[in-house]
């Protein structure tokens, strides 16, 4: 069973492409002294953790910088070619993640649509529009609700096939790796003008409908990214709610998939600003005490394009992130209270 405390283990992973910083003579060898797990040579993919951005050839409406969309593999899952996608996925893994380096955590990062029809909002709404259009053209006499229901069914059935087959293939061809999709379980709660962090009843029942995915995952990887604009108690509430839902889902399955939230060291709404020491402590503490199995520290390559930025991150690791990570892992290992 999942025990909150004492914990069997709690691992903090480094999933930031800091190998780019080697070009500027900035290295992150100190990760080890802070008990942070990383790949050898600081590679982005390897024996500890590997992230695959938009792998294979998922049917997608890819939003371009000029605001238009590029249609890939027929655009939406109900029109897409599964074979083309899986062949491309295998080829990519062979190129960038050969068996000899594979192990640890494997993360499929795909966000061009969500498998629950209703959740395709904002930039993803185009998936709903196209799906509805396809049915409307076939059945011009149907009323709006019939069209939407059919569009939703077709979309969700095909989306499930693409996500499930990809996951099963990944597990089959890289057996040593523990696989999961980035950003799930996900909650769509609250209107945009009034954010709510609670996972509402509808979101929870939709997540239960996704048991076909979670039952096949070795790890659940919800994302916990903070906004600077939030008040301190709102930030804590956000972390608690995201974790509560992931733990609830994990407990639904005999194999109790690990819960490893993705945590970004910058604010979502102010990417130039690193999280304050207080925010790091509060979020790490909440992640630990709410029952997660670890934390994945995430960052993106465009934050590491010059020496100055690399040095800024290195300093942040040395002064704030590293010491806090060390205290958290030490408290778990020694079964002592966390003193910040």
Swiss-Prot record:
Disulfide bonds join 21-310, 187-199. Keywords: Allergen, Disulfide bond, Glycoprotein, Secreted. Expressed by the venom gland. The keyword Cytoplasm does not apply. GO terms for molecular function: hyalurononglucosaminidase activity. One of its GO terms (cellular component) is extracellular region. The keyword RNA-binding does not apply. It holds the Pfam family Glyco_hydro_56. N-glycosylated on at least two Asn residues by identical heptasaccharide units composed of Man, GlcNAc, and Fuc residues in the molar ration of 3:2:2. GO terms for biological process: carbohydrate metabolic process; defense response; hyaluronan catabolic process. Gene3D superfamilies: Aldolase class I (3.20.20.70). It is found in: Secreted. SUPFAM superfamilies: (Trans)glycosidases (SSF51445). Glycans are attached at residues 66, 81. Its main location: secreted. Signal peptide: none annotated. Belongs to the glycosyl hydrolase 56 family. Has no hyaluronidase activity. This is Inactive hyaluronidase B. It comes from Vespula vulgaris (Yellow jacket).
């Amino acid at each position: 069973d999942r025990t909150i405390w004492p914990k069997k283990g709690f691992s903090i992973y480094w999933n930031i492409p800091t190998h780019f910083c080697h070009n500027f003579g900035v290295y992150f060898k100190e990760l080890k002294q802070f008990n942070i797990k990383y790949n050898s040579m600081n590679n982005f993919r390897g024996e500890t953790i590997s992230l695959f951005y938009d792998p294979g050839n998922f049917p997608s409406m890819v939003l371009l910088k000029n605001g238009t969309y590029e249609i890939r593999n027929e655009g939406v899952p109900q029109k897409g070619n599964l074979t083309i996608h899986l062949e491309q996925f295998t080829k990519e893994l062979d190129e960038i993640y050969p068996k000899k380096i594979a192990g640890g955590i494997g993360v499929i990062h795909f966000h061009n649509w969500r498998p629950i029809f209703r959740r395709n909002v904002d930039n993803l709404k185009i998936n709903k529009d196209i799906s509805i259009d396809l049915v409307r053209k076939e059945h011009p006499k149907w009323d709006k609700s019939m069209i939407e229901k059919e569009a939703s069914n077709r979309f969700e059935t095909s989306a499930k096939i693409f996500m499930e087959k990809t996951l099963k293939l990944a597990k089959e061809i890289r057996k040593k790796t523990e696989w999961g999709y980035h950003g799930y379980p996900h909650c769509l709660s609250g209107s945009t003008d009034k954010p709510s962090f609670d996972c509402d009843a509808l979101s929870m029942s939709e997540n239960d409908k996704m048991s076909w995915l979670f039952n096949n995952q070795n790890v659940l990887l919800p994302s916990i990214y903070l906004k600077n604009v939030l008040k301190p108690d709102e930030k804590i509430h956000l972390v608690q709610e995201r974790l509560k839902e992931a733990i609830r889902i994990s407990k639904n399955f005999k194999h109790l998939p690990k819960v490893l939230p993705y945590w970004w060291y910058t604010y979502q709404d102010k990417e130039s600003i690193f999280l304050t020491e207080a925010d790091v402590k509060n979020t790490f503490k909440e992640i630990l005490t709410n029952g997660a199995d670890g934390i994945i520290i995430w960052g993106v390559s465009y934050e590491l394009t010059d020496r100055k930025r690399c040095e800024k991150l290195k300093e942040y690791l040395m002064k704030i992130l590293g010491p806090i990570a060390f205290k958290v892992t030490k408290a778990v290992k020694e079964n002592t209270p966390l003193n910040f």
